[in-house]
UniProtKB/Swiss-Prot annotation:
CDD domains: OAT_like. It is found in: Cytoplasm. This is Glutamate-1-semialdehyde 2,1-aminomutase. GO terms for cellular component: cytoplasm. Its EC number is 5.4.3.8. Pathway: Porphyrin-containing compound metabolism; protoporphyrin-IX biosynthesis; 5-aminolevulinate from L-glutamyl-tRNA(Glu): step 2/2. GO terms for biological process: protoporphyrinogen IX biosynthetic process. Its cofactor is pyridoxal 5'-phosphate. Pfam families: Aminotran_3.
Length: 430
């Protein structure tokens, strides 16, 4: 039986100085119960906590670590960059190279580097409003675009985990121009544009939602969004903060090929450091300050540490890396289904490229209502049983599982061997 005494001690200390003891709500384990392990190191596919317990990590820092923890190329790039200076407050060649890397892989013509996915989506929407002269934004229930006020309405990720409709502190005025529609419902989109098409600046959607669990777009959904927005003079923003450079070298765009007006990126492009970007057509991006009048800025945007880690990650994420991750995800998802089926546990595993979510329901999940209808208590029991056996899953039912190039056969064997006991634990929950 693993011990967690040090983590308990650290969690108690943290709660005296940090709200809830964590700096991002889902880390507090409120959705699954228990005390979160406090991590001290990561190497390859493994995490080690303060009590010396090791875990196969299927979170990968919520997506960024596509090469695994402490990949030598990333560590070397960071050490070299840090030795030269951590921040200059001035342009660098590395940020040009990272922008070139993003442009070469996606349909965007220019990008602006920022520090978080929230900044990226917030800035993209400001640009869309400035470019169109319109105010309203269409988003979809269960899609998560960061914690900017106007986009927290019916959001996924932590907002879904804690069953919040939005958040206290988000005023009616700040969300008044946000139109929330059910996901995967083109008829609802057409109706919104029929009613207020000349007021809608943009539609923003996760290219493949993975923050209410993985709920892929129905065939042709993103393409239809592209057609509707173009017809009405609105812009389409596809959010690839999570899927970008993870599900393929070109993200979800590489799998589907729908080119929006603007895109947002994050996670993998920072290699585990705070970094994100938004980009799009040159005529739109040139409306940003200092070329245009739409203001956007950031003290640490494009900082040398994040750009070094991002470049090292993208340059080492070879086609072989993606093939390996695809195979790892396929093996584990099949094993999960086999274990749950053996115990008679209703479930549905939904994929978005090499991302997947195990929904504890027997029906296809196509929208936020379907995701919320699952048996989250069963997920909590499954999670705790996996954690006790040294497998670190997302501590919430509304998230994706992540794999890396470092998840070798030994790590995957450990995951698979833990599944029967976890399935039994889930089966005991009504």
């Amino acid at each position: 039986m693993a011990t967690h005494l040090k983590s308990h001690e650290l969690f108690n200390r943290a709660r005296s100085v940090i709200p809830g003891g964590v700096n991002s709500p889902v880390r507090a384990f409120k959705a699954v119960g228990g005390t979160p392990p406090f991590m001290v190191s990561g190497k390859g596919p493994y995490l080690t906590d303060a009590d010396g317990n090791t875990y196969v990590d299927l979170i990968c820092s919520w997506g960024p670590l596509i090469l695994g923890h402490a990949h030598p190329a990333v560590v070397e790039a960071l050490a070299k960059a840090a030795a030269q200076g951590t921040s200059y407050g001035a342009p660098t060649e590395a940020e040009v190279e990272l922008a070139e890397e993003i442009v070469s892989r996606t349909p965007v013509e220019k990008v602006r580097l920022v520090n978080s996915g929230t900044e990226a989506t917030m800035s993209a929407i400001r640009l869309a409003r400035g470019a169109t002269g319109r105010a309203k934004v269409v988003k979809f229930a269960g899609n998560y675009h960061g914690h900017v006020d106007a986009l927290l309405a019916a959001a996924g990720s932590g907002v879904a985990t804690f069953a919040l409709p939005d958040s206290p502190g988000v005023t009616g005025a700040s969300a008044a121009d946000t139109i929330v529609l059910p996901y995967n419902d083109i008829a609802a989109v057409e109706a919104a544009f029929a009613e207020a098409g000349d007021e809608i600046a943009c539609v923003i959607a996760e290219a493949c939602p993975a923050n209410m669990g993985v709920v892929p777009p129905r065939d042709g959904f993103n393409a239809k969004l592209r057609e509707i927005t173009a017809r009405h003079g609105a812009l389409l923003i596809l959010d690839e903060v999570l899927t970008g450079f993870r599900v393929s070298p070109s993200g979800w765009y590489g799998l589907e090929g729908v080119a929006p007006d603007l895109m947002t990126f994050g996670k993998v492009m920072g290699g585990g450091l705070p970094a994100a970007a938004f980009g799009g057509r040159a005529d739109l991006m040139d409306q940003l300050s200092p070329e245009g009048s739409v203001y956007q800025a950031g003290t640490l945007s494009g900082n040398p540490l994040a750009t070094a880690a991002g470049l090292a990650t993208l340059r080492n994420a070879t086609p072989e890396v993606y093939a390996h991750i695809d195979a790892a995800a396929a093996r584990v998802s099949a094993a999960v289904s086999e274990a749950l089926t053996a115990e008679g546990v209703p479930h549905r595993i939904q994929h978005g490229g090499n991302l997947f979510t195990v929904f504890f329901t027997d029906t296809e999940v196509v929208d936020f209502d379907g995701a919320r209808a699952q048996n989250t208590a069963r997920y909590a029991a499954f999670f705790q049983a996996m954690l006790e056996q040294g497998v670190y899953l997302p501590p919430a039912a509304f998230e994706a599982w992540f794999f890396s190039a470092a998840h070798d056969d030994a790590a995957l064997d450990r995951v698979v061997s833990a599944l029967p006991a976890a399935a039994k634990a889930a089966a005991q929950v009504a």
